């Protein structure tokens, strides 16, 4: 029903088709041409421009599920620049090619996340900026709808990562600044430090070396704000294995560690020149060991809780030599003292003194 020209449907009119589709608008030579509205029984509605029976130019499509597209069409498909609003709240505004989201655009998710940048086949791909509903921001490369390549993630809590990504995860080389001000530079895997890297803490302390699954593990060097340094093996962020600890006052320990404590065989050199070689347990001299003091005193034998305890040989600065039992650093029990003069006392000792002599000699 409508206008005719020279026997052809041309001008304004209304057409109702056998399949239930209706069209109201402009015609030329019996084809939709110009501006018109097509309504399908299923709820699909197109309002806009037509050329020779094909949707072409500016138009608005309302889909049966409530989604709405407003923008350019070419050869009946979304092509050019347009905005799609989904019933669930998703909104895309940007470029389209052959009916697909393709090119530069802005994508707003129902939860409030917003992406602005390049898209391919409806997915984030190329350079873009994602602003999340909680305020976090990612700026960088995407591939197949995930962060991939190089990019910067800035969290509202102060966490900032700059570096490489793979399939949505922090992976490769990068730098992260933590909310407490600590800075890590190195390699990552599965979103955490993994491989080799250096962390610098706000107080100036540092660790440089191996990492595993976000934890200090392997070989590395730790420096502390009090001047202390440790170089050696770590396990679960504790000194464990072989390592050297150097204090600012000159004390140096080289040897075995376990769970952050000196444990096993080691060598301790003290600031005054004293040297101990032997066993340690829980950070204390314990077991068998040898100590040499700057004044010439030496002791070889048993230790417990950091002090001489057990059986051993003590050589004093004056040349006297005691061989026997010690308790808490004092001669205690059976022992023999060989004096520098050549005299010898054999017997029982208590609190460092001979209390019962069983033999003597020259």
Predicted regions: what they are:
Residues 1, 14-17, 24, 37-40, ...:
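Short beta-strand elements of solenoid repeat domains
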Residues 1-10, 22-33, 46-56, 68-79, ...:
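Conserved anchor residues at repeat-unit boundaries in beta-strand-based tandem repeats, strongest
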Residues 16-19, 31, 68, 88, ...:
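Intrinsic disorder/low-complexity segments
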Residues 353-362:
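Short, low-complexity, Pro/Ser/Thr/Gly-rich segments in the mature regions of secreted, periplasmic
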């Amino acid at each position: 029903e409508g206008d005719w020209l020279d026997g052809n449907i041309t001008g304004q009119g209304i057409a109702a088709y056998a399949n239930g589709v209706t069209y109201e608008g402009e015609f030329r030579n019996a084809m939709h041409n110009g501006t018109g509205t097509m309504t399908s029984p299923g709820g699909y509605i197109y309002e806009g421009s037509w050329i020779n029976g094909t949707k072409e130019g500016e138009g608005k499509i309302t889909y049966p599920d409530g989604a709405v597209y407003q923008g350019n069409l070419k050869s009946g498909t979304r092509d050019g620049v347009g905005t799609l609003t989904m019933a669930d709240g998703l909104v895309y505004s940007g470029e389209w090619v052959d009916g697909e989201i393709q090119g530069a655009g802005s994508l707003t998710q129902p939860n409030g996340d917003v992406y602005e940048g390049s898209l391919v086949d409806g997915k984030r791909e190329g350079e873009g900026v994602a602003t999340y509903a909680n305020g976090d921001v990612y700026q960088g490369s995407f591939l197949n709808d995930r962060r991939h390549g190089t990019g910067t993630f800035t969290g509202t809590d102060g966490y900032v990562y700059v570096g490489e990504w793979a399939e949505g995860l922090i992976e490769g080389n990068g730098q992260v600044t933590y909310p407490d001000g600590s800075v890590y530079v190195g390699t990552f895997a599965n979103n955490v430090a993994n491989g080799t890297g250096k962390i610098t803490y706000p107080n100036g302390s540092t660790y440089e070396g191996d990492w595993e699954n976000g934890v200090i593990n392997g070989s590395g060097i730790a420096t502390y704000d009090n001047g202390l340094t440790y170089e050696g093996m770590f396990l679960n962020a504790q000194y464990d294995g072989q390592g050297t600890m150097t204090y600012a006052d000159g004390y140096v320990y080289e040897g075995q560690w376990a769970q952050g404590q000196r444990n096993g065989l080691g060598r301790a050199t003290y600031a005054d020149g004293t040297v101990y070689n032997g066993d340690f347990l829980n950070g204390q001299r314990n077991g068998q060991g040898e100590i040499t003091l700057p004044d010439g005193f030496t002791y070889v034998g048993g230790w417990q809780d950091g002090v001489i305890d057990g059986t051993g040989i003590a050589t004093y600065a004056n040349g006297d030599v005691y061989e026997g039992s010690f308790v808490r650093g004092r001669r205690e029990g059976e022992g023999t003292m060989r004096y520098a003069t050549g005299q010898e006392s054999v017997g029982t000792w208590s609190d460092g003194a001979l209390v019962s002599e069983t033999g003597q000699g020259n």
